[in-house]
Amino acid sequence: MSFYQKLFASKYDSFMKGIEISFFDLRKELIENLEGKILDVGSGTGVNFEHFHASAEVISIEPSKYMIEKAKAKLPSEKSIKLYNLGINDSELEYMIEDNSLDYVICTLVLCTIPDYELALQKIYKWLKPTGKLIILEHIHAEKKHRKIIQNIINPVWKIVGDGCNLNRNTDEMILKIGFKPDKEEYFKRTLRFYSGIFGK
């Protein structure tokens, strides 16, 4: 498995280059004005770093030791970003983050990879302040039945080569199930179906 993790990390930026160019303005819009205490879930290779406001206090977590090496190279010295080699469901985070303490939690192209993403969203909910917001940019399940069938067939293999990425998750439904309320949400397509938005408690 570590072979695929290492390969995925080494090729991630080049593989995602076209998609990330199309997402640049959306990432910037979602992130650049956020201030206060922020949790960046699954930093990957550090794509979000350039968009963080200089005054924000960012805790950025990434479970892949290969991804985090890429992310370290992108850490801007003028910003307050602390990077940790942790997953969101690791017990260490429970000691680092108090309930009702975060202003924002950012999940961009990461909920597809977290093994227990329902638990992750439950933790995010309890860590956010009553006025806190969840910021989302995720690919989700297909809308049409035949596309869902194809996703379900492909998913087991894709999950291996894609470092745990699931093509077919109902992330939009799970967010609402946890109790989040949308301030803004949008569905759109970039080959896959995507879901972005801002959610309160």
Regions found by a protein language model. Give the residues of each.
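A short acidic, Gly/Pro-enriched loop at the edge of an enzyme's catalytic core
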Residues: N89-V105
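A short glycine-rich, Lys/Arg-flanked "PGG" loop and its adjoining helix->strand segment in the class I
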Residues: E118-P130
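C-terminal alpha-helical "lid/dimerization" subdomain adjacent to the S-adenosyl-L-methionine
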Residues: F15-I19, L137-K189, F194-Y195
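Conserved class I S-adenosyl-L-methionine
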Residues: M1-E35, V47-N48, M67-K70, W158
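A short SAM/SAH-binding and catalytic strip from SAM-dependent methyltransferases
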Residues: D103-D116
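C-terminal lobe and adjacent flexible extensions of AdoMet/dcAdoMet transferase-like proteins
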Residues: S196-K201
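Short glycine-centered segments of the SAM/dcSAM-binding site in methyltransferase folds
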Residues: E57, T131-K133
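Class I SAM-dependent methyltransferase SAM/SAH-binding core
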Residues: L39-L93
